[in-house]
Amino acid sequence: MNKYFAICPRGLEELLTEELRSLGAQYLKTTHGGVHFSGDWTLCYRANLESRLATRILWFIAQAGYRSEDDIYKLAAKQNWPDHFDVSRTMRVVTTAIKCPLKSLDFVTLRVKDAVCDTFRARVGERPNIETRNPNVRVHVFLTENECTLYLDTSGQPLWQRGYRKASVDAPLKENL
């Protein structure tokens, strides 16, 4: 059974919890900005296809305490990234934090990117290309005061952009609002 985190706009967490429960999610835990839950890959696919409240579904990869950027690098370098995606895929690392004591989230992003690329180079002999605008794979790093969590984005584009229209009006609404 895999662990996931569904991101949603603040204030919709309880509704998202009920929506995920109706899809078959287990071990739900509501938090600010989203819901932690467990399930199989079928549930992940269903959540991506059927959720009207989530903006992204993230797949939990690893979590550990940290004191410096080097600890975060070591956590990311320990993961077997080639098992999760192919070296031919482009990638991007996104870092968010709450009460993080580190000075630069951009530096954390760079260190995680280096760890992923170093892991690929050591195990496959080459590294994935970085694409900031439209990557195939998004690695999400979430930092709290003393914990780092790594996720892979299973959604691609934000889910509120489903059915995104080429012709739009001046003030379109997000589809999940």
Predicted regions and their residues:
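Accessory substrate-recognition/RNA-binding modules or partner subunits associated with SAM-dependent
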Residues: 2-137, 145, 154-168
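Conserved SAM-binding loop and adjacent beta-strand
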Residues: 165-177
